[in-house]
Amino acid sequence: NLPQPESATIGAFWVLKTYYIAYFISFLTLFNIWYSNHNLFQIVENIDNTVVILNGILIFEITLIPYFTLWLTQDAYSIASETTFGLLFIAINITYNMAVKAVHKSDPYNDKLIKADYDNLYALIPLAVILIGFGLSYSVFIPGIYISCLIAVIMWIVIARIHRKGVENGKWKI
């Protein structure tokens, strides 16, 4: 649950910024996974058990987001809460990318899937951003992990959109 500000002032809202940022990161992650899977499964013709199992693991990881988000919001300057929040997002990113690779492997002759090229290296950029956040949190700026998670999720969305537009316009590899 998001707490309500104690008064109708910007200052009261600002006190709760960690809650709102963490909630926003969680929402963007859920939306992006749903939207990406929606687009991916529109063109997939065959899936195997590996795809189903990896998506089941991904769903489990997603169910952990509210728990770790709440822990983070209770103490955004805790290395333990920052670390577990970041590790969850790393796990989600890795599992999602593994699931996409599994989809490609289970449907290797699907021309639409090959053209869409969901299995690309650009998907690893958000993971690198989160890892940079770990470096920040453990060296100079404790909230670095959750800020890097926000940046990574936004990058994930932007990269996917640019990539999709590039494929639609014939600018990416086909």
Please state what every model-predicted region is:
Residues 1-174:
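Multi-pass alpha-helical transmembrane bundle typical of ion/small-solute transporters
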